Amino acid sequence: MSFILPSESIDGTHPCNGLHMNGQDSLVQPLLTDFYQITMCYAYWKTGTHNEPAVFDVFFRKNPFQGEFTVFAGLEDCLRFVENFKFSQSDIDYVKKILPENAEPEFYEYLETLNGSHLTIEAVAEGSVVFPKVPLLTINGPLAMCQLIETSILNLVNYASLVATNAARFRQASGWKIQLLEFGLRRAQGPNGGLTASKYCYIGGFDATSNVLAGKLYGIPVKGTQAHSFICSFSSPAELKVRLLNHKITNEKADLFQISMEKRAWLLDQFSWKAALSEVSDGELSAFVAYAIAFPDTFLALIDTYDVIRSGVVNFVAVSLALHDLGYRSMGCRIDSGDLSYLSKELRECFVKVSTLKGEYKFFEKMSIVASNDINEETIMSLNDQQHEINAFGVGTHLVTCQKQPALGCVYKLVAQSAQPKIKLSQDVTKITIPGKKKCYRIFGKNGYAILDLMMLEDEPEPQPNQQILCRHPFEESKRALVNANKIIKLHNVYWKDGEMITPLPTLNEIKEHVNESIRSTLRQDHRRYLNPTPYKVSVSERLYQFLHTLWLQNAPIGQLE
């Protein structure tokens, strides 16, 4: 099975993204579902309700990571899934095996006819900041067909939105000047988890990935250095088989190792290092030279294999100056262990000293320092408090596995059937659904930031700027406010109707830009802060409030006491 590039096509007409494989070998296909979706589909068909028009909302109840915002992601994957939805003959044969023997054969004929042509999908733009209870997608169509796609839709939205949000939080913590590199493939939950993580970490705010396949499939910049094993593979200069490097301008060959040795000896005489020559590893120097010969224009060395201060930085500077003599410029160094703040400041101090040795070494004071080593949000904020000198973070485990919260918890709920509203009740008020087909708006105040999201019944007149709007908490009667909107944005667009895309889909880079813009222009700083962020308000109109509570009372059983 081979992955298809985003610009390529399964059948010559329909583009396909990297989550999908050739034809019915796709990872995302009709049988990527829970068994009870198929049993419910059969029950709907058996009772003749399978074609009744239905409306389902996809939403979540609580923002992840103890924060107050979520980044919506996975919309294109959902649309591609619906676009390519079709049971194969082998799918039908398998369903026959798992359903009871007395299931009517006509049901399988019905399954063969199913596709996404009768569905209508409205959604928030991918990459938007979203909040609890507001529908991310609203799916209209035949009841059974809507039911069949539930699990797949949730699978495509839940993790994508979770990891994109996690990436956005890392970006918020690090600031906008730091480069963020996603190094999570080896720690991800399987190959598809790794690909999904790379894609959605990129839109969430990361600059590049180490995942080569993600780079191929999605056009994400690919970055990487070397592992400790590469450094350890050289024990002495005798193992360095190639030492010559062509000068970048003159093309004359020079012995890079010999020049590096001379630079190292010269450096140790120039100022007081925290290292003696006897402590500096010749094997490490050999490894750096080998890598520099292979990549003279992009040399970035891992310097903590033995000792950052007593060996790594000395060898790195020596090789970098040797490269400079041959017309090349090193990119920087990486540290993967130890006290990252202390080491980064020591490295920067060293680089500044080197930059003063000769005018032509001025570039060294800006040499890039990359840090990795199990980095999370808290680590970055602590490093910020310590005024670190790091230019880039390589983040893996805590990013792609979302260790702080492993699931978002999106749900897929029936809100209308045959034009009749549907409501799910619960003793836990937060789990009561908001019934009916709705339209949603984002209300902005005079300071330019969003005040709240407002849900209204579909047939209500649109709210207007500069007019007071009564906004109510869905469940708490006393929480209400009159809002004078400076600007109002409708949140949903129709993306899929009558078997085709209605709204053009943005590129990955356009989604990435939208995430950045959505967070910075929508949310006040107090909504974004790490500790005790201010909750963002999600409200309902007066009519929807009354509608919800009337339906709630109509459906809630009346208890009897004796």
From Swiss-Prot:
Record-listed Phosphohistidine modification sites: 228
CDD domains: NAPRTase_A (cd01570)
InterPro entries for the chain: Aldolase_TIM, N/Namide_PRibTrfase, NAPRTase_C, NAPRTase_N, Nic_PRibTrfase-Fam, Nic_PRibTrfase_pncB, Nicotinate_pribotase-like_C
Residues annotated for 5-phospho-alpha-D-ribose 1-diphosphate binding in this entry: 397
Transmembrane segments: none
EC number assigned by the record: 6.3.4.21
Co-factor requirement: Mg(2+); Mn(2+)
Modification after translation (UniProt): Transiently phosphorylated on a His residue during the reaction cycle. Phosphorylation strongly increases the affinity for substrates and increases the rate of nicotinate D-ribonucleotide production. Dephosphorylation regenerates the low-affinity form of the enzyme, leading to product release.
NCBIfam families linked to this entry: NAPRTase_put
Family in the record: Belongs to the NAPRTase family.
Protein name according to UniProt: Nicotinate phosphoribosyltransferase
Organism, scientific name: Caenorhabditis elegans
Taxonomic lineage of the native organism: Eukaryota, Metazoa, Ecdysozoa, Nematoda, Chromadorea
Gene: nprt-1
